[in-house]
Regions:
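Divalent metal-binding segments
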Residues: 2-6, 11, 15-26, 30-277
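Non-catalytic terminal/interface segments that mediate subunit docking, oligomerization
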Residues: 278-282
Length: 282
């Protein structure tokens, strides 16, 4: 079935036709953008409907996010959010938490509500609102339940003793310059990579990671994006990411394009070649 969408204006970003007033679609595929009169050849002898829902609106191309990191989003989105900003997500809304006391209260609620047999991952902490974080502070609320508090920037995290024991952090292995403060349970920048390598069995667990990618698809579509890019594919584990991304970010149910580039710090040609052969992802 053909559908003719009328609009007050269509911004095409095409120099040969900067503006239009109609879009013709068949089964979700755009056939033509232009004026209603120019679409007569498509409509002649065909069943079609005219959709006026955009008649007084402006249609513009989808947004492009060249710095999204799908794997990072897939890791973060299943976590519990405690953030200073309100998040309106397709599956619910997260209210802002803007004080140290409120952060601790929310963490205590999560500790009480969530499965005690599972580690607790919290994302969204920022010291400007939530005060100084430390292993001791986490343990004063979560005790010896493995708990990870991930900074809003993603560039640092904090773990309590139980979490460090769970992932195999060995205090004697921590050397000066590793950007790790073992007494505070603080892993940042270079030290974050050390932590991630040990957290991967949990944050990249197949079921959790797949669920995170499904949430990513919802978020990208919800935000009106039609193209996303990642210049650091493989920041967690290249093989696991490449396989999961190729399965999740292609197909008829994915309403956006994805451009993946292997993380520059990956060594050798093998990783780049594998990136170039991700089927269906350009």
């Amino acid at each position: 079935m053909l559908t003719l969408f009328k609009a007050r204006s269509v911004i095409t970003m095409n120099d040969s036709l900067p503006r239009a007033s109609a879009v013709l679609v068949r089964d979700g595929v755009v056939l033509e953008v232009g004026e209603e009169v120019t679409m007569a050849p498509w409509l002649r002898g065909q069943d079609y409907v005219v959709d006026d829902q955009f008649a007084d609106k402006i249609i513009c191309p989808g947004f492009i996010d060249p710095h999204l990191h799908p794997s990072m989003a897939a890791v973060l989105l299943p976590m519990e959010f405690i953030t200073a900003m309100r998040w309106k997500l397709p599956w619910g809304e997260v209210e802002p938490v803007t004080t140290e006391a409120a952060f601790d209260q929310r963490m205590a609620t999560l500790v009480a509500e969530k499965d005690p047999q599972q580690p607790l991952f919290i994302w969204g902490y920022h010291q400007l609102w939530h005060g100084a974080m430390s292993k001791a502070r986490i343990e004063s609320i979560a005790g010896q339940r493995p708990t990870v508090v991930w900074h809003r920037s993603f560039h640092e995290l904090y773990m309590n003793s139980a979490a460090m024991e769970m992932v195999g952090v060995v205090a004697e292995d921590i050397k000066p310059g590793m950007q790790i403060n073992i007494e505070r349970g603080h892993f940042y920048e270079g030290g974050l990579g050390y932590a991630i390598n040990r957290l991967n069995p949990w944050i990249l667990a197949p079921d959790k990671y797949a669920a995170g990618l499904q949430r990513l698809k919802q978020v990208v579509h919800h935000g009106g994006h039609t193209s996303i890019g990642d210049l650091a594919t493989g920041m967690f584990n290249f093989s696991a990411e490449a396989e999961a991304l190729s399965q999740s970010l292609e197909g008829d149910d994915v309403p956006f394009r994805t451009r993946l580039v292997a993380r520059p710090r990956l060594r050798g040609r093998r990783s780049i070649c594998r990136r170039n052969h991700l089927p269906g992802i350009y």
